[in-house]
Amino acid sequence: MKKHLLALGLLLVGVSPAQALDVGDISSFMNSGSSTLSKTIKNSTDSGRLINIHLERLSSPLDGGQVIPMDKPDEVLLTPASLLLPAQASDVIRFFYKGPADDKERYYRIVWFDQALSDAQRDNANRSAVATASARIGTILVVAPRQVNYRFQYANGSLTNTGNATLRILAYGPCLKAADGKECKENYYLMPGKSRRFTQVDTANKKGRVALWQGEQFVPVK
């Protein structure tokens, strides 16, 4: 599974070591100009899987984030919420944002319950086996503000997000430490109000480059 984590630690519920369901990126972003998002999931095993999906709103995607009420019952819709996924098959799950069109960034945890189809069909006498053959996977959905305001400050190798939407920031160029090699690259997600210092790339070097993504727009910084 690709793991593009939010900076400072992404809240993630337990994932089985022998994960059968591939849900793609751990962090998914719905930009301000879009109200829909699609995620492709894949069953990489040789048996069918029963997949159930539900979504809950978080105060923050970072460690310590709490589940909080939705602003409205149909704030985010998804389809399908339950499906049978055959062996080595894939399917697309679609999410629809119907929430407030304001200046707040919103965070949601998508919880994927993955269960072997053979276990789901067993009778009550054998139901204890279901827990060991099931996985509960958590991924993050970030919905950018509908009234987005991208702003940032950069100084001395440190970027601060002074806007209201998460930025994807990157630096590349000569390594700061010789032990790291000649060329280094750093990528992070930077939430509103947070700062990040680049520690591997020598950003003071004239060949060092700093840039960021504002939604789908690439912005050179240095």
UniProtKB/Swiss-Prot annotation:
SUPFAM superfamilies: PapD-like (SSF49354). InterPro entries: EcpB_C, Ig-like_fold, PapD-like_sf. Residues 1-20 form the signal peptide. Induction: Positively regulated by EcpR. Keywords: Chaperone, Fimbrium biogenesis, Signal. Part of the ecpRABCDE operon, which encodes the E.coli common pilus (ECP). ECP plays a dual role in early-stage biofilm development and host cell recognition. Belongs to the EcpB/EcpE family. This is Probable fimbrial chaperone EcpB. It comes from Klebsiella pneumoniae (strain 342).
